[in-house]
């Protein structure tokens, strides 16, 4: 929120009890700060830390009343962006996302937001914005690529089908983390911690990533 023209809020995947109540009372998933429905935002960014969280992605989209598949979304829906460690292998969940940050998103935030502001008032299509986003280094737009697979499910080929999509999407790295933002007071769930363990972050990122 360092930009005066952008307001970023938080949202989390509800636990089973709240999920049940929200569905029964038809309450759409909403932001923590404003309580505005997620479906009314311009973007929905989802951090994907582990493969076991993939079902949470569908839960968030479903509770938000956002079409699950990117191809079914319209100008009335937010752009869904994936980020985090699992985006290094995005294909298993590619059809649910409009965009992926490959690597660290801080390097592309400003350019993407500026492109969105320019597009928003232009009257252009959703696809045209994605074409502009595909030109930003580090952004992967699944719509603009054709993936073919071997019989064992491994990736056989990966080919752009749009003139604006690069043949290779280069991961982005923040080389100097001295001034990189870090959440000092993260929201934590009021539930029993998995395996009764403590997670202590001693560095940014993964030494094998």
Walk through the language-model features, giving the residues of each.
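Conserved mixed alpha/beta core segments that line enzyme active sites in large multi-domain catalysts
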Residues: 53, 60-62, 69-73, 180-197, ...
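N-terminal [4Fe-4S]-dependent radical SAM core
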Residues: 142, 148-199
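Conserved hydrophobic/aromatic pocket- or pore-lining residues that grip, position, or stack substrates
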Residues: 139, 180, 206
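Glycine-rich beta-alpha loop elements in corrinoid/cobalamin-binding modules
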Residues: 14-162
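Local cysteine-cluster metal-coordination motifs and their immediate loop/turn environment
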Residues: 201-209
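A short beta-strand-loop structural module common to alpha/beta enzyme folds
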Residues: 4-17
